[in-house]
From Swiss-Prot:
InterPro entries: DiaA (IPR023070), GmhA/DiaA (IPR035461), SIS_dom (IPR001347), SIS_dom_sf (IPR046348), SIS_GmhA/DiaA_subfam (IPR050099). Homotetramer; dimer of dimers. Required for the timely initiation of chromosomal replication via direct interactions with the DnaA initiator protein. This is DnaA initiator-associating protein DiaA. Belongs to the SIS family. DiaA subfamily. GO terms for molecular function: carbohydrate derivative binding.
Amino acid sequence: MLERIKVCFTESIQTQIAAAEALPDAISRAAMTLVHSLLNGNKILCCGNGTSAANAQHFAASMINRFETERPSLPAIALNTDNVVLTAIANDRLHDEVYAKQVRALGHAGDVLLAISTRGNSRDIVKAVEAAVTRDMTIVALTGYDGGELAGLLGPQDVEIRIPSHHSARIQEMHMLTVNCLCGLIDNTLFPHQDD
């Protein structure tokens, strides 16, 4: 058991090192995409499943409340939090549409969809991205593995942050770190002189 614990930490550290080498440009582009959308009076819609849903909620909460700095609230909506909406859509046998319907209802040109999917193949996330494209939204995608179907849907204005790993737990850990990094970059860019 002790050896397994060490392996978990070692794998996580190795993934962080690989990501630190591979992802700064993509994370910077994503942060600036989010900042420009907010500065233009737009909002960020976020979605994911399971742990990715938790990461989406964490991002939205950090925008609406605060991350590490006291500042005005920023408009972000986690699409996975309204159980009535989710179950109403799913009850009509539209499981794949639980996020896409919300994107079509709430998304506008200039908004950003933050789509989080470990493998990039979750049907409801893929459909949400397709809906965002029809609404002229920009997509920031957090993925892993080979990026899955999601990676193939992204255009030149979109940003994929693909964690360099084929291990779901490590990808999800890095998604949380990436979300925290994005929140910090947004705060530092929009409110550079705010005190903690």
